Amino acid sequence: MNVIEGKLNLTGNERVAVIASRFNHLITDRLVEGARDSFVRHGGKDEHLDLILVPGAFELPFALEKVLAQGDYDGVCCLGAIIRGSTPHFDYVSAEATKGIANVTLKYGAAVTFGVLTTDNIEQAIERAGTKVGNKGFEAMTGLIEMMNLYKNIGA
C-alpha cells in the first residue's frame, strides 16, 4: 500500500497567514506565539508569516474568505478563544465560527486549520494556550504545515 502524507518541514518559501481574534487577547496572543514558534521551528521564515487580527471569533470566516480569494498564501491558520459565559452567546459564536471556517475552506479547497479554543472557563483556555495541555496555536500551525505538504503530494 502506498501511503501519502504531509511532512513537517517547510522550504522557507511558503507564505502563511494567521488570522486571530483579538477578543480574549490574553489567550489568543499566546496562541499566536505558539503558531509562530511552530512555523519558524519547521523551517518557515518569519517575514513570510502574516498576522491578520479580527475583533472576535465570529469574524474569522469573513477574513478567511477575503484572504483565500486573494490567493496570496499557501495556508491559513485560524486562531481564537471562545469561553462559555452565562448566556447562549457562546453557542452561537462557536457554531457560526466553526461552520463558517469549514464552509470557506471547502469552497476554496485550501490548506486551513482551526485553532479556535471553545472552553467552559478561563482556566481551560489558559491550559490550552501554553501551560498544562500544550499550546493549541502551535498544534494548529503544525497541522497546517502537514496539510500544505499533503496538498503538494496529492496535487491539490
Swiss-Prot record:
EC supergroup of this enzyme: transferase
Residues that, per the record, bind 5-amino-6-(D-ribitylamino)uracil: F23, A57, F58, E59, A81, I82, I83, F114
MF terms per GO, please? Answer: 6,7-dimethyl-8-ribityllumazine synthase activity
Q: Which GO terms describe its cellular component?
A: cytosol; riboflavin synthase complex
Which CDD domains does this one have?
Lumazine_synthase-I
User: Where, in this chain's numbering, is (2S)-2-hydroxy-3-oxobutyl phosphate bound?
Assistant: S86, T87, R128
InterPro entries noted in UniProt = LS, LS/RS, LS/RS_sf
Q: Name one GO biological process term.
A: riboflavin biosynthetic process
**E.C. code:** 2.5.1.78
- Which pathway features in its UniProt record? Cofactor biosynthesis; riboflavin biosynthesis; riboflavin from 2-hydroxy-3-oxobutyl phosphate and 5-amino-6-(D-ribitylamino)uracil: step 1/2
Which Pfam families does the record match to this protein? DMRL_synthase
Q: Which reaction does it catalyse?
A: (2S)-2-hydroxy-3-oxobutyl phosphate + 5-amino-6-(D-ribitylamino)uracil = 6,7-dimethyl-8-(1-D-ribityl)lumazine + phosphate + 2 H2O + H(+)
Transferase as a keyword of this entry, yes or no, is yes
* Function recorded in the entry: Catalyzes the formation of 6,7-dimethyl-8-ribityllumazine by condensation of 5-amino-6-(D-ribitylamino)uracil with 3,4-dihydroxy-2-butanone 4-phosphate. This is the penultimate step in the biosynthesis of riboflavin.
Family per similarity comment: Belongs to the DMRL synthase family.
Q: What name does this protein carry?
A: 6,7-dimethyl-8-ribityllumazine synthase
Species of origin reads Wolinella succinogenes (strain ATCC 29543 / DSM 1740 / CCUG 13145 / JCM 31913 / LMG 7466 / NCTC 11488 / FDC 602W)
